[in-house]
């Protein structure tokens, strides 16, 4: 990643609402340069979306679950492709999900094959989510373990933030 790209990314991690003009002023480059860099980062898929990080407890969510699952058998690439190919069916299935799931990915560790992170308004909603995970089509679940986070507990060490990537990007750019 070029220096100007890293700097634009760092500023966007801090605040993605800033205009290209504001970014250009902060970075001491021209506004068209910022626009070109941002457009290129979007086209290359480095920037996938612009979003906010709210106080989820003020939106009514009380729990975050990090769910680790082990499968009885691996899900084949063909099955994954088939599921992606049936987008309408997947949207309908997702609408049956009682909780917003922010990530669901295959991986390794904690005696698990996949991990999901979801938000829940009640413990009952969390248990419905676990039932939803167990009945997912074409996936045979062997074991599920969860880690629950109480969003109303004010003694957390660090709340969700992406702004830490700003310093990281700039620091690692200097090291390379």
Regions found by a protein language model. Give the residues of each.
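A compositional/biophysical signature of low hydrophobicity enriched in polar/charged and small residues
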Residues: 1-176
């Amino acid at each position: 990643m070029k220096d100007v790209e890293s700097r634009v990314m760092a500023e966007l991690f801090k605040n993605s609402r800033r205009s290209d003009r504001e970014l250009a002023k902060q970075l001491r480059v021209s506004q068209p340069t910022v626009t070109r860099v941002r457009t290129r980062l979007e086209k290359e898929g480095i920037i996938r979306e612009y979003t906010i990080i709210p106080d989820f407890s003020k939106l009514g969510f009380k729990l975050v679950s990090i769910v680790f699952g082990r499968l009885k058998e691996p899900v084949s690439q063909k099955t994954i492709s088939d599921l992606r190919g049936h987008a309408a069916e997947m949207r309908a299935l997702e609408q049956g999900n009682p909780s917003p799931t922010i990530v669901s990915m295959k991986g390794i560790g904690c005696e698990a094959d996949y991990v999901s992170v979801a938000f829940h308004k009640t413990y009952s909603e969390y248990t419905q989510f676990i039932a939803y995970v167990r009945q997912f089509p074409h996936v045979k679940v062997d074991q599920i373990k969860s880690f629950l986070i109480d969003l109303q507990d004010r003694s957390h060490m660090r709340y969700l933030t992406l702004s830490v990537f700003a310093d990281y990007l700039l620091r690692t750019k200097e090291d390379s």
